[in-house]
UniProtKB/Swiss-Prot annotation:
Family from the record: Belongs to the glycosyltransferase 28 family. MurG subfamily.
Entry binding sites for UDP-N-acetyl-alpha-D-glucosamine: T14, G15, G16, N126, R162, S190, I244, Q289
InterPro entries membership: GlcNAc_MurG (IPR006009), Glyco_trans_28_C (IPR007235), GlycoTrans_28_N (IPR004276)
SUPFAM superfamilies: UDP-Glycosyltransferase/glycogen phosphorylase
Protein name: UDP-N-acetylglucosamine--N-acetylmuramyl-(pentapeptide) pyrophosphoryl-undecaprenol N-acetylglucosamine transferase
This protein's UniProt keywords: Cell cycle, Cell division, Cell inner membrane, Cell membrane, Cell shape, Cell wall biogenesis/degradation, Glycosyltransferase, Membrane, Peptidoglycan synthesis, Transferase
Gene3D superfamilies given in the database record: Glycogen Phosphorylase B
Length: 356
């Protein structure tokens, strides 16, 4: 070889696509690879990825779900433009391998990578594959999945998650050394989760004072004031935060996590080895958050409550019925279903397929 190998990561739109792509990018860069990212100027990747000193290429292409007739009518033209932009980017970058991590932009770029003979690796983060990956899986050299049996011929690698989660102590060591009230971590994500913000304070208020858990509740900057008002109205003390810098430590300190069921959240809960109650976002595409959560809940490794069934009374009863030994068993089962080597495995496959 005349120089370092080059990885082109295609990912955009949401953190669920971008963060696992970054994990693989860092792993290969530590091995001497050059990394370039292909995304959309309007996606979160446009501001997040450059902070990791990764150069970017951009194409213009968006989704169709929920869009009007004009957008659908213009699809052929927009797709043709995205194809040409992808070809130009691929010729500039000359990647040794292309890694598609999801998002609409992966479709035109992935198709052109295959057409130009570049090795194409796909990774699907959710339990139900997105439309772009369903199509690209037919032309990809390797198909990788975070959950079992998501795409035909796919290898179950798990989701690449933040490295520090794999280094946490075993659930048995963490749970056995605790005493006193349960510790509950509520995670709403960067945008918050209004249903959790409303129901959790009311549920805790229904518990007798001596049976109340210690609560840390993360809600996102836009909802933090409302959340704090909800706890004040319920007369429940809680640590309320707009964001959490050290999620690994937050997971490690919790007996129970109450959260949505995005692919990365489910994977992080398993990797950390912590008990969880998943409340899937009811409007997720193809209801994929429910099937994400079922990967753990059907094995007794998590609880699953649909948002329509989430009430203060029901949540209070559930919390009152849980014991630390029960939660420890749940956490142990969750850790057993984790794929701690996901980042290394995806990077390894990229290395195997790379060519000049």
């Amino acid at each position: 070889m005349t120089g370092p190998r080059t990885l082109l990561v295609m990912a955009g739109g949401t953190g669920g696509h971008v963060f696992p792509g970054l994990a693989v990018a860092h792993a290969l860069r530590e091995q001497g690879w050059k990394v370039v990212w292909l995304g959309n100027r309007t996606g979160m990747e446009a501001t997040l990825v450059p902070k990791h000193d990764i150069p970017m290429e951009f194409i213009q292409f968006g989704g169709l779900r929920g869009k009007g007739l004009v957008t659908k009518f213009l699809l052929p033209l927009n797709l043709l433009r995205a194809f040409w932009q992808s070809i130009a980017a691929l010729r500039r970058v000359r990647p040794s391998v292309v890694l598609g991590m999801g998002g609409y932009i992966t479709f035109p770029a992935g198709m052109m990578a295959s057409l130009l003979g570049r090795p194409l690796v796909l990774h699907e983060q959710n339990s139900i594959a997105g439309l772009a990956n369903k199509v690209l899986a037919k032309v990809a050299d390797r198909v990788l999945c975070a959950f079992p049996d998501t795409l035909p011929g796919g290898e179950w690698t798990g989701n690449p998650v933040r490295e520090e989660l794999a280094h946490l102590d075993a659930p048995e060591a963490r749970y056995d050394q605790r005493s006193g009230p349960l510790r509950i971590l509520v995670v709403g994500g960067s945008l918050g989760a209004a249903a959790l913000n409303e129901v959790v304070p009311k549920a805790i208020a229904l518990l007798p004072g001596g049976e109340r858990p210690v609560v840390t509740h993360q809600a996102g900057a836009k909802q933090i004031d409302t959340l704090r008002a909800n706890y004040a109205a319920a007369q429940v003390p809680a640590q309320t935060l707009p964001f959490i810098d050290d999620m690994a430590r937050a997971y490690a300190d919790a007996d129970l996590v109450i959260c949505r069921a995005g692919a990365m959240t489910v994977s992080e809960v398993a990797a950390a080895g912590v008990a969880a109650m998943f409340v899937p976002f009811p409007h997720a595409v193809d209801d994929h958050q429910t099937t994400n959560a079922e990967f753990l809940s059907k094995q007794g490794a998590a609880l699953l409550v649909q948002q329509k069934d989430l009430t203060a009374e029901g949540l209070a009863q559930t919390i009152a019925s849980l014991t630390r030994p029960q939660l420890k068993d749940m956490a142990r089962l969750a850790r057993g279903l984790a794929k701690p080597e996901a980042t290394r495995r995806v990077a390894e496959i990229c290395s195997q397929l790379a060519r000049d």
